[in-house]
């Protein structure tokens, strides 16, 4: 008996389709409910109106631009922080400008999937986008640090439903066999927001004001919102029209008890990571208490989710399926490595190599462009060959190699090498970026796709938040050791407080001092050590890829058109 059949027999919420792959049952289905060899999602796939031509382009452009703005907003603030803290005299609030955004986004992420599965996709998306735009406006007009933090929290709440909402819209607008291509375009272009943030933010801060780092979302966002208002957005499944009676009926199904347990647990974990080693020692009662509180709350949450079953915010039958959790691990490892690298490559190019913020952004283009090209190309190839697992494994393997060779960066690495190394790294990321999404879309019935995507994006963002902190710990600890070894006359506290710009590093030693090379080597080696972490993450994603299922998506596509 093969692996797929054994899995289907073990899980009462999984049915086997005639295409040969396991598929999670829809609401109310039990094992054995599928009496004929017909995929229950086939009818909805056949009956759903497919969008083509200019309307499809407009929908894809709208959600891609919205996701780009959302990811840009998460990375653009870094270069604006020095000016913000100077105006508000709020150096102690630096961590909260990022933390408020991530905490709010992480807390609402899983619930957003349940909301999409219950209400109109179009209006739910516009609701989350409106929250994001409102948060951007509050940040732009903020007259105090507290107001700015509040605006970041509102924007974070809005961002929780944008990336998964965009993929839900794409899933409803195009047939399954074309989703890899369109999802690749969507992810490839929107992910540019992560790496373009410092470049765009640096230009806006330098030539206008830091407030335009937030104002930029308003006019661009207005265009995308107006487009969506006048476009017909197909649904994955039929949904009733919005009424207050519908709200009263749906609210009990949203698992708000699960949300009230999950949100504090996620917030406590992230707060412990932000406080640990910064405001409080890692072994302090505050940090330990937060971790313990999070652990207890997660246990209670897991017990509650198990009790409510498929009505849960994160259905246990879904997340316990091998394809779902291995896809989540693979995707989380990839996205975490992207987010961490986006922080430390600029340190290498600005601090070690001496480039300004704008040229530092230009120097990362080899990785950005190769990632954009391969994420689209991999989607086309999956559509042709049908199997996503080889691309998931290859993407993680190439990413591991790319992160490994980046550890060879030094203050004197030739231009040809740092360009080539980034091309290898970007290619690996691009190849594997959308494979987890394809696996989940292929596995889940239409009514569960939004929940599955929301769960996966939560795992990616949560892993990113965790490993950004881990990367910071590694970098800081290594910098202390490296400064003592290569520039002993430089005070460690001064090096840690200097920042990572070209001028600040070179100000640590007198002009013409021979120890300047030691300072640059110390920072370069510290960045290299962070990429050892990213290499390990990529290897973890490589191992997880082999659990994502050897499934030919073309068989399902064929069955849905017969």
UniProtKB/Swiss-Prot annotation:
Keyword field contains Membrane: yes
Topology with respect to the bilayer: Multi-pass membrane protein
Disulfide bonds: none
Induction of the gene: Expression is induced in complex medium (Czapek yeast autolysate medium) supporting calbistrin production. Expression is positively regulated by the calbistrin biosynthesis cluster-specific transcription factor calC.
Annotated compartments: Cell membrane
UniProt xrefs under PROSITE patterns: MFS
Keyword Membrane: yes
Biotechnology: Calbistrin A has been reported to possess a number of interesting bioactivities including antifungal active against Candida albicans and cytotoxic toward both healthy and leukemic human cells.
Residues carrying sugar: 83, 557
Transmembrane segments: 57-77, 94-113, 123-143, 154-174, 184-204, 213-233, 256-276, 284-304, 329-349, 362-382, 389-409, 418-438, 451-471, 530-550
PANTHER family in UniProt: MAJOR FACILITATOR SUPERFAMILY, MULTIDRUG TRANSPORTER, PUTATIVE (AFU_ORTHOLOGUE AFUA_8G00940)-RELATED
Function: MFS-type transporter; part of the gene cluster that mediates the biosynthesis of calbistrin A and related compounds. Calbistrin A is a secondary metabolite with an interesting structure that was recently found to have bioactivity against leukemia cells. It consists of two polyketides linked by an ester bond: a bicyclic decalin containing polyketide and a linear 12 carbon dioic acid structure. Required for the secretion of calbistrin A and calbistrin C, as well as of related compounds decumbenone A, B and C.
Protein name: MFS-type transporter calB
Gene source species: Penicillium decumbens
Gene responsible for this protein: calB
């Amino acid at each position: 008996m093969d692996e797929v059949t054994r899995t289907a027999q073990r899980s009462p919420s999984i049915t086997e389709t005639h295409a040969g792959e396991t598929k999670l049952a829809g609401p109310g289905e039990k094992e054995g409910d599928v009496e004929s060899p017909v995929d229950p999602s086939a009818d909805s796939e056949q009956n759903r109106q497919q969008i083509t031509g200019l309307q499809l382009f407009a929908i894809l452009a709208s959600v891609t631009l919205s996701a780009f703005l959302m990811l840009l907003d998460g990375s653009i603030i870094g270069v604006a922080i020095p000016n913000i803290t100077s105006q508000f005299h709020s150096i102690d609030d630096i961590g909260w400008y990022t933390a408020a955004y991530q905490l709010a986004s992480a807390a609402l992420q899983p619930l957003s999937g349940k909301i999409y599965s219950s209400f109109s996709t179009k209006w739910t998306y516009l609701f989350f986008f409106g929250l994001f735009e409102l948060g951007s406006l509050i940040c732009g007009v903020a007259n105090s640090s507290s107001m700015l933090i509040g605006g970041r929290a509102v924007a974070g709440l809005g961002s929780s439903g944008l990336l998964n909402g965009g993929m839900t819209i794409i899933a409803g607008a195009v047939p399954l066999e074309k989703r890899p291509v369109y999802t690749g375009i969507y992810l490839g272009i929107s992910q540019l927001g992560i790496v373009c943030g410092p470049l765009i933010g640096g230009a806006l801060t330098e030539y206008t004001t830091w407030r335009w780092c937030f104002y930029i979302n308003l006019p661009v966002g207005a265009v995308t919102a107006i487009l969506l208002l006048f476009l017909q957005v197909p649904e994955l499944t039929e949904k009733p029209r919005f009424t207050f009676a519908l709200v009263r009926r749906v609210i009990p199904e949203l698992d708000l008890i699960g949300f009230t347990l999950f949100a504090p647990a996620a917030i406590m974990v992230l707060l412990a990571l932000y406080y640990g080693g910064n405001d409080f020692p890692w072994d302090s009662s505050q940090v330990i208490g937060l971790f313990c509180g999070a652990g207890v709350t997660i246990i209670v949450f897991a017990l509650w989710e198990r009790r409510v079953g498929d009505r849960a915010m994160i259905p246990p039958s879904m997340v316990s399926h091998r394809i779902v959790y291995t896809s989540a691990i693979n995707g989380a490892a990839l996205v975490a490595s992207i987010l961490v690298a986006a922080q430390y490559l600029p340190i290498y190019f600005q601090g070690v190599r001496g480039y300004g913020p704008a040229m530092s952004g230009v120097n990362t283009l080899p990785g950005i462009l190769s990632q954009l090209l391969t994420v689209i190309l991999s989607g086309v190839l999956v559509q042709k060959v049908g199997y996503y697992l080889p691309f998931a494994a290859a993407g993680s393997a190439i990413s591991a190699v790319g992160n490994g060779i980046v550890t060879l960066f030094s203050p004197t690495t030739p231009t040809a090498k740092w360009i080539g190394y980034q091309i290898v790294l970007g290619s690996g990321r691009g190849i594997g970026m959308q494979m987890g999404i394809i696996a989940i879309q292929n596995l889940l019935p239409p009514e569960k796709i939004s929940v599955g995507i929301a769960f996966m994006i939560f795992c990616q963002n949560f892993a990113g938040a965790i490993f950004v902190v881990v990367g910071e710990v590694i970098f800081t600890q290594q910098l202390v050791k490296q400064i003592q070894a290569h520039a002993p006359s430089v005070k460690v506290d001064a090096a840690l407080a200097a920042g990572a710009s070209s001028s600040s590093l070179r100000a640590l030693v007198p002009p013409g001092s021979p120890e300047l090379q030691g300072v640059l080597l110390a920072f370069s080696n510290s960045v290299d050590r962070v990429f050892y972490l990213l290499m390990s993450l990529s290897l973890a994603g490589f191992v997880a890829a082999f659990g994502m299922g050897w499934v030919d998506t073309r068989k399902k596509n064929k069955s849905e058109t017969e």
